[in-house]
Amino acid sequence: MAVRIARFLGLSTVAYLALANGIDARDTISRDVIILGGGSSGTYAAIRLRDQGKTVAVVERNNYLGGHGETYYTEDNTPLNFGVEGFFNTTVTRNYLERLQVPYGRRDPAPAHEDYVNLNTGQRTEYTPGQLQDREAFAKWVDAISQFGFLDDGVYRIPEPVPEDLISPFADFVKKYHLEDAVYALFSHTSGDVLEMITLYVIQYIGVPHAAALNEGYVRPIEGIAALYKSAGKELGSDVLLETTPEAVQRFEDGVEVIVRSADGTKTLLKGKQLLVTIPPLLENLHGFPLSDQESRLFSKWQYHQYWAALVNDTGLPDDVNIVNVDTERLYGVPEEPFIWRLDNHWAPGYHNIKLVGGSEFGEDEAKAYMYERLDLLHAEGTYATHKPEIVKFASHTPVTMFVSAEEIRGGFYRQLYELQGLNSTFWTGATWASDYSTLLWGYTDEVLDQMASS
């Protein structure tokens, strides 16, 4: 009905809805680019666009920029990163940090030794027999995947016909290339049941650039990951609309219009020449978007895992121990979902990071209950004097490892996905479009910004 009335009045649907919602000219913001999402990719894009002389408006649902890059500060102001803990030490990273005048240094984990524990039994075990440690495993793995050089920048530049090895089950790829002794090390850098994954997605978690970064070392802001986004927020100022969500979007060949609602219920009409979408393109995230048939078809194909990052205090665990989960009953020691990936200590006494992964039904309540059960089991078995901890932060990193079937990839899914760039003045970036590591996302975002500039 709104569309028919808008056409009759000679208005865009969004402009009509703006009138219907009582939005007047004083509640309208005009910018060159409207950015949906102020996480790693959206914030980077905003700074780069500003440097190119463009005006921007960043729409972010949280009350902070940075997405998964969160930092908790203790009473003595010690920064504890959870979620994103560092960046690849590359020119892209260094230029960005220096551009925002954020002091940085090498990322050194807190001193600790690793205890291998089967978290299904609560008992100590050993590193999976016959499995290589990280450095040796990565060298063997990189040699096997060097044939897929088109993935070396983290973007899904997949040739057609698609190499069958690339879309084979990872377990089959392991056997074909005799990688059985490298599986556990690779699992520790993925998210999900690695034995059930398609090889492509394992590479996008621990490919050539990732292995190089692990060998060369990461960097991180000295005052915490959040310091980067605080600096960006200060520079962007009122161009960032925090605690704000899009309600209606209209896209044309010559511009876009977006109605957004802030936390206090205020509605604003944003008008832009281009739209940059950095949020995960799931159908449930795109309410209010009049999607094309191709967009709807592609975005309906996604599957993903649930990933939770917990920062806890007072667990009863020793301060100098990291717990690595090894399932001695499964092939290569790789746990089955849901599982606790690992428990890592922090630079502040008493604090630990706990990373939990599960399927689509592994919600926040289920994840917390699972975490408590595992800690109780460690206590019951006498492995550690654990008890129910204080949850300082419990952050959702869902969706993680967004993937589609081998049949979809073989049929040109990623080619069709990238063909969406620029249609109806809309561009896309973020973890769906490249490997989910900030440095690689920034590199791909630069490519998208070049496309926007030339369109």
Swiss-Prot record:
Keywords: FAD, Flavoprotein, Oxidoreductase, Signal, Virulence. Its cofactor is FAD. It is an enzyme of class 1 (oxidoreductase). Disruption phenotype: Impairs the production of cyclopiazonic acid, but accumulates its biosynthetic intermediates cyclo-acetoacetyl-L-tryptophan and beta-cyclopiazonic acid. Its EC number is 1.21.99.1. GO terms for molecular function: beta-cyclopiazonate dehydrogenase activity. SUPFAM superfamilies: FAD/NAD(P)-binding domain (SSF51905). It catalyses: beta-cyclopiazonate + A = alpha-cyclopiazonate + AH2. Residues 1-25 form the signal peptide. Belongs to the beta-cyclopiazonate dehydrogenase family. Beta-cyclopiazonate dehydrogenase; part of the gene cluster that mediates the biosynthesis of the fungal neurotoxin cyclopiazonic acid (CPA), a nanomolar inhibitor of Ca(2+)-ATPase with a unique pentacyclic indole tetramic acid scaffold. The hybrid two module polyketide synthase-nonribosomal peptide synthetase (PKS-NRPS) cpaS incorporates acetyl-CoA, malonyl-CoA, and tryptophan (Trp) and utilizes a C-terminal redox-incompetent reductase domain to make and release the tryptophan tetramic acid, cyclo-acetoacetyl-L-tryptophan (c-AATrp), as the first intermediate in the pathway. This is Beta-cyclopiazonate dehydrogenase. The lineage of its organism: Eukaryota, Fungi, Dikarya, Ascomycota, Pezizomycotina.
